[in-house]
Amino acid sequence: MAETLSGKTPLFAGSTGGLLTKAVEEEKYAITWTSPKAQVFELPTGGAATMHEGENLLYIARKEYGIALGGQLRKFKITNYKIYRILPSGETTFIHPADGVFPEKVNAGREKVRFNARSIGENPNPSQVKFSGKATYDA
């Protein structure tokens, strides 16, 4: 998925502390969002920046920074942020929210992952599962 990201980088006086140097060998992340007005927000790595009115694009070193920044943006009632992984080859992958709905929201179409329809008292004996060759979530 070679997607072109657009937007202005927020204004901040400072540096990333060398965190983006790993992007040359590994990967970097980008978060995009749309702001109704220019306002100051806290960066997940420390410090503050001023977002632009309209589209914003910020490159970050870790996905966790994007999740934390998303929490900061929600304080401003901005919920349309998206997080992308960018490989050194230039390949861009959309990673959050993966199915378009944030994890803490209910999505009727979302499939349950590793779900067993039983109570904890109905779980099998761990000693019987250990050497059976089955994974614990399949037992």
UniProtKB/Swiss-Prot annotation:
One of its GO terms (cellular component) is photosystem I reaction center. It is a peripheral membrane protein. One of its GO terms (biological process) is photosynthesis. Keywords: Membrane, Photosynthesis, Photosystem I, Thylakoid. It comes from the Bacteria. It is found in: Cellular thylakoid membrane. Pfam families: PsaD. InterPro entries: PsaD (IPR003685), PsaD_sf (IPR036579). The cyanobacterial PSI reaction center is composed of one copy each of PsaA,B,C,D,E,F,I,J,K,L,M and X, and forms dimeric and tetrameric complexes. PANTHER family: PHOTOSYSTEM I REACTION CENTER SUBUNIT II, CHLOROPLASTIC (PTHR31982:SF5), PHOTOSYSTEM I REACTION CENTER SUBUNIT II-1, CHLOROPLASTIC-RELATED (PTHR31982). Belongs to the PsaD family. PsaD can form complexes with ferredoxin and ferredoxin-oxidoreductase in photosystem I (PS I) reaction center. This is Photosystem I reaction center subunit II. It comes from Nostoc sp. (strain PCC 7120 / SAG 25.82 / UTEX 2576).
